[in-house]
């Protein structure tokens, strides 16, 4: 009994606060920053905004505290039964003599939990309209292509090699992490960064790329911040995440989805050789059509010349008829008056009073003369009207008006029309609307 009493006298004595603090220091100093996987149970969110729950595995339980600022950064709702991976620090709570994990980061664990979170997030963002935007067209020949991906690995090399192979152009690389807790934010910041560049340095299209992997590996590309940055980008975005069977939320918000990073490079630029071949085909069609058009217009000019000659002959003929009619009218008037005077003299002075017959015949003659003059005027007006119509038609068909529209007439020294580049004429006279020029062939 004395020994025991002596021993108790030499043992260090602690207050409750002291021993609690010692345990707290022991936990924090020996474990530091750790990761723990388990299932959420007993979740409670206090009015202060802090979350309290247990992380359990079979019969083992670890108390967890998630402070409000950390809880606000978690991008999916917490539920009992959800399997998660928590990063944080172990500590103790002196109020009830228990240790707990202070949460600093929380991610879903297990395929089922991740699929559930993904479906809920997809439905919510789709309801907001983030997947129903009007897709921006991918430029046909971009001067600069922005690539957001990891600077290491085969993806960036595949993209650069494919672009150089098809149509070499300037590539701007924005290196990011494509996996991990903060990679979604990094990629979103890269998209925003490209959009904030000056116009002279801004790419015409952005490729966001990553190689294949599991749903956990590609989880960053389901990040809500990244989806919103993709939706808000003023620059067209091609998403190229994983393989053809892999789909992430960025694919739904991008302007075009490529099944692989190599395919994204193919979407971004055409093949130069094919483009050159297409241009040559277009050139041939253009030359052929132009030659046919020139030939058709040359024939039209020839037809216009024939019509002009016919119209000139027709108008001259009608003018001659008009002149002859006018002369006949003028010549017939004195004869008519003379005839009437002769008839008047033949009447017997005993049967008709001279004064009355003269008055009557004068009146009759006046009416007839007026009628003849009126008929002559109407005939003249009719011919003048027809002459004006024919003149307008002739003017519209005049080849000078054709020259006004940008055509030219080419003649050789012999005066013959030249319609082919194979002519043997050495000196060409080219007639434009406002004058002629002479050209000498080499």
Swiss-Prot record:
InterPro entries: Exonuc_VII_L, Exonuc_VII_lsu_C, OB-fold_nuc-bd_dom
Compartments it resides in: Cytoplasm
Keywords, sorted A to Z: Cytoplasm, Exonuclease, Hydrolase, Nuclease
UniProt catalytic activity: Exonucleolytic cleavage in either 5'- to 3'- or 3'- to 5'-direction to yield nucleoside 5'-phosphates
GO biological process: DNA catabolic process
Annotated GO MF terms: exodeoxyribonuclease VII activity; nucleic acid binding
EC number assigned by the record: 3.1.11.6
Record's keyword annotation contains Chloroplast: no
A Pfam family: Exonuc_VII_L
Gene Ontology cellular-component terms listed: cytoplasm; exodeoxyribonuclease VII complex
UniProt similarity note: Belongs to the XseA family.
Stated role: Bidirectionally degrades single-stranded DNA into large acid-insoluble oligonucleotides, which are then degraded further into small acid-soluble oligonucleotides.
Subunit: Heterooligomer composed of large and small subunits.
Protein name, as recorded: Exodeoxyribonuclease 7 large subunit
Organism listed in the record: Rickettsia bellii (strain OSU 85-389)
